[in-house]
Amino acid sequence: MNNATFNYTNVNPISHIRGSVIITICVSFTVILTVFGYIAKIFIKNNCTNNDIGLRERIKCSGCEPLCNKRDDISSPRTGVDIPSFILPGLNLSESTPN
């Protein structure tokens, strides 16, 4: 007498359907968010200019720059973290050399 065996005919079809619906909703939500993200990225990229908000000289990594492909900026590849302009508004990150 083994009570641990699982009989697949006793699976509740309602709970099975409910689980499938939840998984489908989660996957659909993820796909919709991804599509909206790409659409928003395209709109933001089209609205960027090479001198966005006039802060390019003061802060090289402005908030819009990672989404824009600047063809005139052929400097060395950027490394590190992009610093949005609204986080450090008073900091001068121009090409300065330490003492």
From Swiss-Prot:
Subcellular location(s) per record: Virion membrane
Membrane topology: Single-pass type III membrane protein
Transmembrane stretches, start-end: 19-40
Glycosylation sites: N3, N7
Keywords: Glycoprotein, Hydrogen ion transport, Ion channel, Ion transport, Membrane, Signal-anchor, Transmembrane, Transmembrane helix, Transport, Viral ion channel, Virion
Record-level Gene Ontology MF annotations: channel activity
GO cellular component, one term: membrane
Domain of life of the organism encoding this protein: Viruses
Pfam families: NB (PF04159)
Family affiliation: Belongs to the influenza viruses type B glycoprotein NB family.
Function: Putative viral proton channel. May play a role in virus entry.
Quaternary assembly: Dimer.
Protein name: Glycoprotein NB
Gene for this chain: NB
